[in-house]
């Protein structure tokens, strides 16, 4: 393996680690259709607000999502549309296996 492939594998591993929670997969799926505020994610996913916020922090730290102020709220969006495709493919693959 080369240094470049090692770095690519490490980056991919970090991305997959950040996505390795069902609620985070749900958040990414919701954000695939556009920016959402925390309360919109809470309503869509049926999860408590503190838990959604905690998972958003993990996704922000992994640079999967970014936040932009929208009035008194922060609207979260995906940093890269490829992430939505990765998650959609993973969910589709998991459903096929059942």
Which residues does each PLM region occupy?
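Alpha-helical DNA-recognition elements
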Residues: 58
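Short acidic/polar alpha-helix capping motifs at helix-coil junctions
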Residues: 2-5, 37-38, 52
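N-terminal helix-turn-helix DNA-binding core of bacterial DNA-binding proteins
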Residues: 10-50, 70, 74-82
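Amphipathic alpha-helical dimerization/coiled-coil segments
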Residues: 1-11, 29, 81-98
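Glycine-centered, phosphate/nucleic-acid-interacting loop/turn motifs that mediate DNA/RNA or nucleotide
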Residues: 63
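Residues within the DNA-recognition helix of helix-turn-helix
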Residues: 55
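Short beta-strand "wing" residues that participate in macromolecule-binding interfaces
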Residues: 66-67
């Amino acid at each position: 393996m080369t240094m470049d492939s090692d770095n690519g594998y490490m980056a991919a591993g970090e991305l997959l680690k950040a996505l390795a929670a069902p609620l985070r997969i749900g958040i990414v799926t919701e954000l695939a259709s556009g920016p959402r505020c925390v309360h919109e994610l809470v309503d869509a996913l049926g999860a408590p607000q503190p838990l959604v916020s905690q998972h958003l922090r993990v996704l922000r730290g992994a640079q999967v999502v970014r936040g932009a102020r929208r009035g008194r709220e922060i609207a979260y969006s995906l940093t890269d549309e490829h992430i939505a495709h990765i998650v959609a493919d993973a969910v589709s693959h998991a459903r096929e296996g059942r």
